[in-house]
C-alpha cells in the first residue's frame, strides 16, 4: 500500500503541478473483507489526513456502531482522493461534487486500491462511487440496500452519510440499509475461508 500511495502522489503532483493537492488516502484493515468507498474528502478530512472524520464521518461511525460493525475491521476510502472545492458567493472555499474528469482520472487508482485490499464486499456511499463502479445509468435511489454482483465482487450501495444531514427524510432508509448490511455480514462471518481473488473491472 505504501508503493500505491507514493505512485498516486507522484501522479497527482505531476498532473496538478503547482496546485499542492492534499491527498487523503484510505485506511483500515490491510485485507479487510469489507471496503467502504465514499465520494471525496471534505475540509476536516483534508486537515486531519483521514477519510470520514467530519460530520458525515460521525454519522457513519454512529450507524456502524448501531449495526454492530467495527470500523477498525473495515477499509475506508474515497473515489477521488483530494477535496474538490469552489468559491461560494461569499468568497469562502466550500466543497463541491467531484467532476466527471476527476472521477475518470482517479478510477484506475481506485481499481488498483480495490485489488490491493481484495475485499469480499464493497459498500459504496453515495452516487459517485456507485456510478464509477457500475456505470452512469446506476441510480442510488433505485439500488440502495441491495446486494449486487459486479465483476465478481459483491457490491452494496448506500446513501452517503452526509445525505442524512442535508435530507433528514433519508435517515430511516439509511439506518435500515446499514442494519441490513450489518446483519448480512454477521450471518456470513462464520465463513472465514479465503475467497478467490477476482480482477475488478469497473464499468465505464
Regions found by a protein language model. Name each.
Residues 1-204:
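A polyanion-binding, active-site-adjacent surface
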